[in-house]
Amino acid sequence: MCIRDRTGRHWVLTGYAPNFPDGQAKGIPFNEIYPSLGSIISKELGHRGAVPPYIEVPEPLGAGGPGYFGAQYAPFTIETDPVEPTFEVRDLNIAKDVNASRFERRKRLLQGADTLGAGGKSDGKAATMQTYYEKALELVTSPQAKKAFKIQNENEAVRERYGMTSIGQCSLLARRLVEAGSRFIGISHGSWDTHVDNFTGHEKALVPPTDQAFSALIEDLEQRGMLEDTLVVMMGEMGRTPRINKDAGRDHWSMSQAVIFAGGGTKPGTVIGASDKTASYPTTTPYSIQDLLHTILSLMGINPAKIYETPLGRPVPLVNGGSMISELIA
């Protein structure tokens, strides 16, 4: 992934445009500055069941993270692809040589060591670590969490409907995780950075599996009565140039792009905005990434203007400006 892609992802996931060209600000990676959308939702809405509230699959989205919220709001990254026959979530199972009795002894030993080390006192850092341990233990011992991640147990016809592709099985896994209580699932799919041979890449590798997976997810959520309570957003970090380059590809373009919303209180079957005949620039009121994040957080019941203080005491709003895209709301 090139620097511009990473910078674009940071902007899309946090709403804050990086003001440093090389992805670094005085040696600090930019995913350590502002919290990403998933981390905001994780902090504001919290856990709901044993599964982590914020999950990324099949790999980290990149350029987004917990920022000044701290590591407890970082995503749980699966980093294996559910389309693989051997798909298994790392660290989800207790070691084979540790039976239930031994596991309980280890847990009591850890609790005793924590109490001794704290000297009967519990500061903020100690309490945070204790929360880590408790959530980790809940994850590895929860039958519900194991069931949610066990995509191999899904009905074969359902798996085929989503498509036996990375985006298909990631979308199906996302539905299972939302059912189990997860708040935010981030899915990354392939490389749409088609600087070379754009049309073949879209026609054969990118569009068909995405179309199948997305339509299956919407239908599945609707049939299960989940769509009105689940917001689905499909987007990239930028658009592509209207003009084809010398390699039959399209380059980076930040002036115009499309985003798809479904469910979660949005209005179905609605096209908002328009562009010129070459899709170069909007011909109606343009919307910013801040408008987009403002709308998403509002639909999730979160105040996008809420102020947090960084560790240095600097007041920072969740979203730096923006307003609701009212035409989108049902």
Please name every model-derived segment:
Residues R4-A330:
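Ligand-binding pockets and gating/stacking loops
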